[in-house]
């Protein structure tokens, strides 16, 4: 697929790109290369190929779900102004 200068200009306007007349040929060549690659990919027969999310079937390595932090509630509540039964007491702000 080969693009014309008008088509390249239209694509540039739609993409809000400022392309000078001297740059159109270089941009057209790059776009032609991209569209050529797309045509090659579309020509591949994928009938019977099952869709996949990743190219390789690998399991995600996860760490063991173990507690890594000790319970420090008493240390945190020791510096609080008021606590009761493991809860923080705060002044009433809504009447």
Curated annotation (Swiss-Prot):
Keywords: ATP-binding, Ligase, Nucleotide-binding, Protein biosynthesis. Allows the formation of correctly charged Asn-tRNA(Asn) or Gln-tRNA(Gln) through the transamidation of misacylated Asp-tRNA(Asn) or Glu-tRNA(Gln) in organisms which lack either or both of asparaginyl-tRNA or glutaminyl-tRNA synthetases. The reaction takes place in the presence of glutamine and ATP through an activated phospho-Asp-tRNA(Asn) or phospho-Glu-tRNA(Gln). One of its GO terms (molecular function) is glutaminyl-tRNA synthase (glutamine-hydrolyzing) activity. InterPro entries: Asp/Glu-ADT_sf_sub_c, GatC. It comes from Azoarcus sp. (strain BH72). Its EC number is 6.3.5.-. It catalyses: L-glutamyl-tRNA(Gln) + L-glutamine + ATP + H2O = L-glutaminyl-tRNA(Gln) + L-glutamate + ADP + phosphate + H(+); L-aspartyl-tRNA(Asn) + L-glutamine + ATP + H2O = L-asparaginyl-tRNA(Asn) + L-glutamate + ADP + phosphate + 2 H(+). GO terms for biological process: glutaminyl-tRNAGln biosynthesis via transamidation; regulation of translational fidelity; translation. This is Aspartyl/glutamyl-tRNA(Asn/Gln) amidotransferase subunit C. The lineage of its organism: Bacteria, Pseudomonadati, Pseudomonadota, Betaproteobacteria, Rhodocyclales. Gene3D superfamilies: Glu-tRNAGln amidotransferase C subunit, N-terminal domain. Signal peptide: none annotated. It is an enzyme of class 6 (ligase). Belongs to the GatC family. Heterotrimer of A, B and C subunits.
């Amino acid at each position: 697929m080969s693009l014309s200068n008008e088509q390249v200009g239209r694509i540039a306007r739609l993409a809000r790109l400022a392309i000078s007349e001297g740059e159109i040929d270089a941009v057209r060549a790059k776009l032609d290369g991209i569209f050529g690659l797309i045509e090659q990919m579309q020509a591949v027969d994928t009938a019977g190929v099952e869709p996949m999310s990743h190219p390789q079937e690998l399991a995600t390595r996860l760490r063991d779900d173990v507690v890594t932090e000790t319970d420090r509630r008493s240390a945190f509540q020791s510096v609080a102004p008021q606590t009761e039964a493991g809860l923080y007491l705060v002044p009433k702000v809504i009447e």
